[in-house]
Amino acid sequence: MFKTKEALIPYLLLAAALAGGLLWHESEMVPGLGRTVTSGQIAVGGPYALTDQDGRPRASSDFHGKYQLVYFGYTFCPDVCPTTLAVMAAALDKMGVDQNRIVPVFITIDPERDSPAVLKKYLAAFGPRFVGLTGAPQQIAQVEKEFRVYAKKQPMAGGNYGMDHSSVMYLMGPDGKLVGFYDEAIQPEDLAKDLKKKI
């Protein structure tokens, strides 16, 4: 992952939208995030139809009725993506039976390389609960837009490339609407505690 000013855009958009109509809970400070979204509406997320790591079609409607913890990244990511997925997995492990109310979802920002088979092998390291999603580049671009995700290909030596991208975990409610969001700096125990409050 590359850190650029553009990668901060989703945070700024979310903060602006929050300031425009959401309620902040000053008393609920979460390390790695600060204030967390506790009520109100924000236009994040939307309908999509992608393919999971087993090659099966998956639509956003498949997850209705359950909470989702959604993260956008890519399997060739050298640092923040595996670290964040590990935090998600550890947080869910700390939630006991409540973890069954949340589906952890990893959506690739690199559909050219992240085939279903690649996603399946990659996500196996984080446990069986994860749903990995990929699709055609235009499908992924649309989902990125819906979730206000920044992702841009960055050329590297030897013809390879990395991805500069925002790093946000989105907690989506059973109705598919945003409940809260977290950055990669949050610790598993803090994430687990806040998730338990919100679900």
Residues of each region from the PLM?
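N-terminal targeting signals for export/organelle localization
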Residues: M1-P47
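Short active-site neighborhood of thiol/selenol oxidoreductases, capturing the structured segment around
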Residues: S61-T84, M88
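Hydrophobic beta-strand anchors of alpha/beta hydrolase catalytic cores
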Residues: L69-V70, P104, M169
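Thiol/disulfide oxidoreductase modules built on the thioredoxin-like
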Residues: Q139-D194
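Short, hydrophobic alpha-helical segments
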Residues: L195-I199
